[in-house]
Amino acid sequence: MAAGAPKAQNIVWSDSLLSTHERSLLTGCRGATIWLTGLSGSGKSTVGALLEKRLIESGLLAYRLDGDNVRFGLNKDLGFSEGDRKENIRRIGEVCRLFTDSGVVTIASFISPYKSDRDAAREIFAKDKLLFLEVYVKVPLEVAEARDPKGLYKKARSGALKGFTGIDAPYEEPAAAELTLNTQEMTLEECVQKCLDLLEKHGGMSFVAIYLVFAPLHANARARCCSLCRIFRDLLTSVLGACKGVRSGAGSYTYMVCGVMGRSSATR
């Protein structure tokens, strides 16, 4: 059997009636995956949780997948051997791809210590031209160990926990992450804002969300901004939908125009 081929036979892929681009035009949301990687105690879950909250408050579809949480269900059959870690990341990469294809900004908070596994996850997105952004949540080992929120470093040092990343199992630092967050030097808010800026830079935020992120925080003002953006979205979708010759580039143009609108609104 070819490497990466399904074990099951007699299966046929069923295509959607909408392309990823058409779905994003109709919903006003472009999916993306932000892959937070780093040592235990680096701050991945903390950054991911607040980032998810900020995105949802901005009107964007977002969902966070956490390394511990998925082991209570989807990956409860996996341990922490090198092979199980590899399968853990493979499964999560596939789940993130599905979420991203549906228009959800997916935040994956996983130690994911091996570069080959992270690269394999990125490749899943590349073949479908979906947005994958690797964020290295960086902190010195001694700082992560001093934090030790789950008491795992203490167990590893005592020998009660074997194969723990950073102690007796390796962590391979990303060489080309789209963003590095030094949580020893940056505040939580600064880290989250850097992630939002990264998403905007790569077009991974819907134009309604970009407008709200930069709009005034007063409830009535936010509601008016949201209403205006939806009207603008519907108008552009109608116009661009009629221009079938330029349809393939319509989405990025829409995001760009409305991103500029959002920034200018904050200065008024």
Regions inferred by a protein language model and the residue ranges of each:
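ATP-dependent NMP and nucleoside kinases share a basic, alpha-helical "lid"
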Residues: 73-80, 96-156, 163
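Conserved lysine of the Walker
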Residues: 44
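Cysteine-centered motifs
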Residues: 225-229, 243, 258
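Hydrophobic anchor at the beta1->P-loop junction of P-loop NTPases
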Residues: 36
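Conserved substrate/cofactor phosphate-moiety recognition/catalytic segment
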Residues: 49-97, 101
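Small-molecule kinase domains that catalyze NTP-dependent phosphoryl transfer to phosphate-bearing small molecules
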Residues: 138-197, 201-211
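Extreme N-terminal, non-catalytic leader segments
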Residues: 1-33
